[in-house]
């Protein structure tokens, strides 16, 4: 059976993690894990994830999945090869842009994290200035991770010989939107993404990459590499819209933001019902 005239075995399936593939406990359910392993193993499906997360948390989350394709991580600024345990296809922010972005944060009295690739597998995260309770929890939950190391109270946090992949901040969504508008107006050498926290809409996240970086661009790059003739993408949040629009077929979970469901080809069940894995399995079986 063919879908849109394309053999489904050459379909690349790409899912966001938080709010989409993960449950509300921010983990993969046992049902999703077993279904994904059947998709990859028995059915020969081409599956991966595209996420704002770093390998430091993606690798533990995906450890039971028999992944064969690179993960698209850090909002598309890198891929992670789970077979080799190493970064691939990194897109660094030049140091002049890092300085320009940090200047904008200074004007707004905000203090970002700068994520830098250290070697082929480590991520060094630099920060200077006070941290909110939310940021303190964020750091505490990640201090033990084997693929990430924090450098806090780093007076020279802007500068390093390591490649900068991401400048990141968490704050009230309205505050971050103002900073994002300033960045778009004054720093043309960066890409800016601001979106809501799925657990509290008044809170948000701001991500800055080198210009042209996105999950959408990384997905299209991976599709070319694996020879996929059809791309299906799953998402829930505003930062998923571009990759959904770049897909041949886009799928929103029921719990997605209204703006996401409005542009999707199809809306399926919620993230709490293993909906993404079940949809992919059914799509492959029908072929």
Identify the meaning behind each predicted range.
Residues 3-12, 29, 205-287:
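Mg2+-dependent phosphoryl-transfer enzymes with acidic/Ser/Thr/Gly-rich catalytic loops
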Residues 30-138:
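Active-site phosphate-binding/coordination module
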Residues 65-67, 75, 186-188, 246-247, ...:
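Short, structured coil segments at secondary-structure junctions
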């Amino acid at each position: 059976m063919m879908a849109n005239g394309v053999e489904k075995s050459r379909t690349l399936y790409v899912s966001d993690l938080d709010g989409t593939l993960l449950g509300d406990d921010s983990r993969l359910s046992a049902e999703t894990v077993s279904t994904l392993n059947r998709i990859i193993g028995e059915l020969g499906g081409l599956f991966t994830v595209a996420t704002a997360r770093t390998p430091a948390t993606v690798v533990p989350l995906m450890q039971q999945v028999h992944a064969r394709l690179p993960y698209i991580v850090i909002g598309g600024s890198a891929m992670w090869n789970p077979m080799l345990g190493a970064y691939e296809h990194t897109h660094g922010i030049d140091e002049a842009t890092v300085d320009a972005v940090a200047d904008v944060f200074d004007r707004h009295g905000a203090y970002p994290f700068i994520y830098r690739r250290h070697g082929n597998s480590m991520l060094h995260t630099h920060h200077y200035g006070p941290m909110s309770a939310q940021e303190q929890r964020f750091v505490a939950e990640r201090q033990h991770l084997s693929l990430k190391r924090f450098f806090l109270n780093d007076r020279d946090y802007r500068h390093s010989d390591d490649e900068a992949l991401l400048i990141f901040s968490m704050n009230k969504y309205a505050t971050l939107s103002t900073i994002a508008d300033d960045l778009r107006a004054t720093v043309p050498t960066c890409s800016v993404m601001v979106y809501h926290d799925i657990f509290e809409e008044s809170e948000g996240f701001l991500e800055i990459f080198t210009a042209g970086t996105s999950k959408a661009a990384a997905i299209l790059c991976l599709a070319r590499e694996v020879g996929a003739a059809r791309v299906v993408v799953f998402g829930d949040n505003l930062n998923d819209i571009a990759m959904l629009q770049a897909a041949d077929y886009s799928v929103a979970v029921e719990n997605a933001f209204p703006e996401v469901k409005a542009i999707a080809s199809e809306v399926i069940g919620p993230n709490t019902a293993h909906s993404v894995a079940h949809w992919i399995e059914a799509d492959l079986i029908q072929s």
